[in-house]
């Protein structure tokens, strides 16, 4: 399975029930094709950078998931035929560095410290602890 991120923007004219229904529909598309949704972000109603189909606002939703590449074509097809989707994007994370970034984004979305941040904090803590010991040795030698 590969790592993906998708974001779609729904028309602002949809009522809350319709928005929830569309979100659930796309989640089911991923899971029915053996995909695993790691996390999702409901970004809500936002201003668009530019007018799209006579709309100045849109409802943004982001999902981070793992899936087989063959499923992506179906997901994109379903985005395209749905008139309520103003825009969408699917991003594939391929390289080791990209996959690490994907994990960091998922951790941040889940409000967990990222793997890279933990490594940095451990290194920083060890460095500051080493510096404190060196400083205390210097003060004893005077």
UniProtKB/Swiss-Prot annotation:
Highest rank taxon of the organism: Bacteria
Protein's name in the database: Small ribosomal subunit protein bS6
Region (Disordered) location: 110-142
Protein family membership: Belongs to the bacterial ribosomal protein bS6 family.
Protein's organism: Helicobacter acinonychis (strain Sheeba)
InterPro entries given in the database record: Ribosomal_bS6, Ribosomal_bS6_CS, Ribosomal_bS6_sf, Ribosomal_S6_plastid/chlpt, Transl_elong_EF1B/ribsomal_bS6
Gene behind this protein: rpsF
Keywords: Ribonucleoprotein, Ribosomal protein, RNA-binding, rRNA-binding
GO molecular function: small ribosomal subunit rRNA binding; structural constituent of ribosome
Listed PANTHER family: MITOCHONDRIAL 28S RIBOSOMAL PROTEIN S6, SMALL RIBOSOMAL SUBUNIT PROTEIN BS6M
């Amino acid at each position: 399975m590969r790592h993906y991120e998708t974001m779609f923007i729904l028309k602002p004219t949809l009522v809350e029930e319709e928005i929830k229904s569309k979100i659930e529909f796309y989640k089911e598309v991923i899971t029915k094709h053996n995909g695993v949704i790691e996390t999702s972000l409901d970004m809500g109603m936002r201003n668009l950078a530019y007018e799209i189909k006579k709309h100045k606002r849109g409802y943004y939703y982001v999902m981070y998931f793992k899936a087989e590449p063959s499923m992506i074509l179906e997901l994109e097809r379903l985005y395209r035929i749905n008139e309520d989707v103003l825009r969408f994007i699917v991003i594939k994370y391929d390289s080791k560095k990209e996959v690490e970034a994907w994990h960091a984004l998922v951790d941040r979305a889940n409000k967990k410290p990222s793997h890279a941040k933990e490594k940095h904090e451990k290194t920083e803590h060890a460095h500051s602890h080493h510096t404190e010991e060196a400083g205390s040795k210097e003060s004893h030698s005077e």
